[in-house]
Design a protein with these regions (language model features):
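Active-site proximal loops enriched in glycine and acidic residues that flank catalytic Cys/His/Asp
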Residues: 56-58, 64-67, 86-88, 95-99, ...
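A short, polar/proline- and glycine-enriched secondary-structure boundary/capping micro-motif
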Residues: 28, 72-75, 103-108, 132-133, ...
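Carbohydrate-active enzyme catalytic cores, enriched for enzymes
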Residues: 1-95, 99
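Solvent-exposed beta-hairpin/edge-strand motifs
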Residues: 5, 119, 129, 217-223
Length: 223
């Protein structure tokens, strides 16, 4: 568990803001990590969780390529599939909205939406559906999300570069679209390249009308 916390830490010492994580004190996290074995090998991957970590030079990128958890654990999950956060040294560059503070819970539905994350949003619609059911919400403490049902993700090394390729079908049922994302972090960590695509499932897709989309990149407030 401690190794996973280290895996999810950005250059400023804080955890990446995915699925209900908010801004926390790096000192508190450092205290927990102090109990880790100093000679333990760091996690190279965290495949069961769906999270991906790209580190080269002073650059760190952490991305979410997992499906939502089961309903009973999804009351704080966000619709941020294929979103990422990025730091250069100790400076945060791109960040997700994260969970709002306890005094700002009215913003929680918006914070959980796809538009609050560094990823593509189609037709101003989140890639996951918020399931509103009074009894279910009372039982698990909030409205869970459902979807995407399938997320594919690979992380490979090519001549020192790290290449992350992923896709999700969160927009397939509503719009017939699959979101593909490819990000390459150079061997030095000084350059990043990215490509986002929308395709049909298997056969060529002809849309009945134009669909707006936006690729969100949320800069950290200090940039």
């Amino acid at each position: 568990a401690v190794a996973f916390l280290r895996f999810m830490r950005l250059g400023d010492g804080r955890l990446a803001r995915f699925n209900g994580v908010s801004v926390a004190s790096p000192a508190g996290l450092a205290t927990v990590l102090a109990y880790d074995d100093l000679f333990a090998k760091p996690l190279a991957s965290a495949r069961p969780s769906g999270y991906v970590n790209l580190r080269r030079g002073a650059t760190t990128i952490i991305a979410d390529a997992g499906v939502p958890p089961p309903f009973e654990f999804a009351n704080a999950a966000h619709a941020g599939c294929l979103s990422f956060e990025m730091s250069a040294g100790a400076r945060l560059l791109f960040v997700n909205g994260g969970a709002p503070a306890s005094s700002d819970q009215d913003w929680r539905p918006q914070a959980r939406g796809t538009a609050s994350h560094n990823t593509m949003c189609v037709n101003e619609t989140s890639s996951a559906k918020l399931v509103r059911h009074r009894g279910l919400e009372a039982m698990i403490g909030g409205a869970p999300i459902r979807g995407p049902l399938e997320v594919k993700s690979t992380l490979e090394e090519a001549n020192g570069d790290l290449v992350w390729t992923a896709s999700h079908n969160g927009y397939l049922g509503r719009f017939g679209l699959i979101h593909h994302r490819k990000m390459t972090l150079s061997a030095s960590g000084a350059a990043i390249r990215g490509i986002d695509r929308l395709t049909g499932d298997e056969t060529p897709l002809r849309l009945k009308s134009d669909l707006p989309y936006a690729i969100h990149f949320h800069l950290h407030p200090e940039i």
